[in-house]
């Protein structure tokens, strides 16, 4: 009997925390499906969602301020377990008659959590060895606990850091269990969703593939699908998944826009057309893209130009494919969340997404997005399960607009050729020195400025290439990767000696924030 992987699910209500997506990822790591929605989700929609449990996120506001974000009173009457995190705990406390006030001493960063008595099921194993390290980020605290609630934990600066009313299945923590700085936080979330909410863990790569294949077959029927294949992880996994579901009904369009990595086009064709037997049409559109980008320096406008031209080319190709009724995309869940936030005004859209932009009315193509429920790590796991090459599945993220947003300012063919060669050397050296898989993302950036140099007996005046490598768990924050000096020196020497037009290499040591990972 086929398992319904959505039958057990957790609802996460977002109050504006920078960590909310991490909550969802921790729940998924427990092999339980969840969705993230704004805090003001209507009760009718919540009842229709029928959650096995609810998590209230943190947030930047104070619960005692006029107009502070809140939930409907009926939420706590649904009879399902509720876990409040930071602001969520304070909201729950205030709702049930407790008191929340500004803290005499705010807590931001590491803290030692101490147990106040009997920890109970949620905290089983959390205090092994005494104090448990946690991550705090709050300026308010609960000064009076509501009737029926027990204080479970405290810190040196905050007397109430975890509360519970076991009889009503209500739990609250002042710290952030979703972040890596709380080492046992994933264990706490796992306990909540599985032991307390009763979810048994159907959300696994094999089950997700089986469910997606069925849904694609039901959605598409006998109609044909066209997919824009970029060679990146998301579109590659989407192509493999759809091909498993409908076989030759899928035609992939691989647009070589002249802004891809070195030999990427040939690699894509080998993997999909030759090894997997997927129908792939290769479109050489380098001149069209470079012509459209000529003279444009604004990064957001470059993204829009590239996105619009991709849609235009897909439209042309779909008209050549008989009965093409669907356009498939590799949209993933973080894209959906961020784009939805941009529409509602409840999140700040830092960069426009290449995939989630909607389709022009005239295209008359229906949209197929089989990965839209998945985070990147889940997409990779599915890619491996589908048999895609390990190197393709675990390749570092590559932006939809390609090298266009790694060339600062105007995009020119000369710049793209220089950049792709420099980038290839950088990545090759990271592999050979065993750094690649320790780094979350690495790439070269072309700087359209020249500097004076000396080669042999002659003076040079050539371009600068910047190298960027970062470590991150979630891509919301990132630290620059401390590449050893000897490796930096070797990479720099190779680029300067092997890439004509470059006489200087610099290494980016900026973290996110304040810098973003990509330069544009």
Swiss-Prot record:
It comes from Pelobacter propionicus (strain DSM 2379 / NBRC 103807 / OttBd1). The keyword Nucleotide-binding applies. Keywords: ATP-binding, Glutamine amidotransferase, GMP biosynthesis, Ligase, Nucleotide-binding, Purine biosynthesis. Residues 9-202 form the Glutamine amidotransferase type-1 domain. The active site is at residues 86, 176, 178. The gene is guaA. GO terms for molecular function: ATP binding; GMP synthase activity. InterPro entries: Class_I_gatase-like, GATASE, GMP_synth_C, GMP_synth_GATase, GMP_synthase, GMPS_ATP_PPase_dom, NAD/GMP_synthase, Rossmann-like_a/b/a_fold. It catalyses: XMP + L-glutamine + ATP + H2O = GMP + L-glutamate + AMP + diphosphate + 2 H(+). It is an enzyme of class 6 (ligase). Catalyzes the synthesis of GMP from XMP. This is GMP synthase [glutamine-hydrolyzing]. ATP binds at residues 230-236. Pathway: Purine metabolism; GMP biosynthesis; GMP from XMP (L-Gln route): step 1/1. One of its GO terms (cellular component) is cytosol. Its EC number is 6.3.5.2. The keyword ATP-binding applies.
């Amino acid at each position: 009997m086929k398992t319904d992987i959505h039958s057990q699910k957790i609802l996460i209500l977002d109050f504006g925390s920078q960590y909310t997506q991490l909550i969802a990822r921790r729940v998924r790591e427990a092999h339980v499906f969840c969705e993230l929605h704004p805090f003001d989700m209507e009760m009718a929609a919540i009842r229709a969602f029928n959650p096995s449990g609810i998590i209230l996120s943190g947030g930047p506001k104070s619960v005692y301020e006029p107009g502070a974000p809140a939930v409907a009173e009926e939420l706590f009457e649904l009879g399902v377990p509720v876990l409040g995190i930071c602001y969520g705990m304070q909201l729950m406390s205030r709702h049930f008659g407790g008191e929340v006030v500004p803290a005499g001493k705010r807590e931001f960063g590491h803290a030692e959590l101490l147990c106040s008595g009997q920890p109970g099921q949620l905290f089983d194993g959390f205090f092994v060895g005494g104090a448990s390290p946690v991550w705090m980020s709050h300026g308010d605290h609960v000064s009076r606990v509501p009737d029926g609630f027990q204080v479970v934990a405290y810190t040196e600066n905050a007397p109430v850091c975890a509360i519970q009313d076991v009889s009503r299945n209500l739990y609250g923590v002042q710290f952030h269990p979703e972040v890596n700085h709380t080492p046992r936080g994933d264990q706490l979330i796992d306990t909540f969703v599985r032991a307390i909410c009763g979810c048994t863990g159907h959300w696994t790569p094999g089950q997700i593939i089986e469910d997606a294949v069925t849904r694609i077959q039901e959605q598409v029927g006998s109609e044909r699908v066209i997919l824009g294949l970029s060679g990146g992880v998301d579109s590659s996994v989407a192509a493999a998944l759809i091909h498993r579901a409908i076989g030759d009904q899928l035609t992939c369009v691989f647009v070589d826009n002249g802004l891809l990595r070195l030999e990427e086009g040939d690699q894509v064709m080998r993997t999909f057309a030759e090894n997997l037997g997927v129908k792939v049409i290769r479109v050489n559109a380098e001149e069209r893209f470079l012509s459209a980008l000529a003279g444009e320096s604004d990064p957001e406008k470059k993204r829009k130009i590239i996105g619009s031209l991709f849609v235009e080319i897909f439209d042309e190709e779909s008209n050549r494919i008989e009965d093409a009724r669907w356009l498939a995309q590799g949209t993933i869940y973080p894209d959906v969340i961020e784009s939805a936030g941009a529409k509602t005004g409840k999140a700040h859209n830092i960069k426009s997404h290449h995939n989630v932009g909607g389709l022009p009315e005239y295209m008359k193509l229906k949209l197929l997005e089989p990965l839209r429920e998945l985070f990147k790590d889940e997409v990779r796991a599915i890619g491996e399960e589908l048999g895609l090459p390990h190197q393709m599945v675990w390749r570092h993220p590559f932006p939809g607009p390609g090298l266009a947003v790694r060339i600062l300012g105007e995009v020119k063919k000369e710049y793209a050729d220089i950049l792709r060669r420099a980038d290839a050397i950088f990545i090759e050296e990271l592999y050979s020195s065993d750094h690649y898989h320790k780094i979350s993302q690495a790439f070269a950036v072309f700087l359209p400025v020249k500097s004076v140099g000396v080669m042999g007996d002659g003076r040079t005046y050539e371009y600068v290439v910047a190298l960027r490598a970062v470590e991150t768990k979630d891509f919301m924050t990132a630290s620059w990767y401390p590449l050893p000096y000897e490796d930096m020196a070797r990479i720099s020497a190779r680029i300067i000696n092997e890439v004509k037009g470059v006489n200087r290499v610099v290494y980016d040591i900026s973290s996110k924030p304040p810098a973003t990972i990509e330069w544009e």
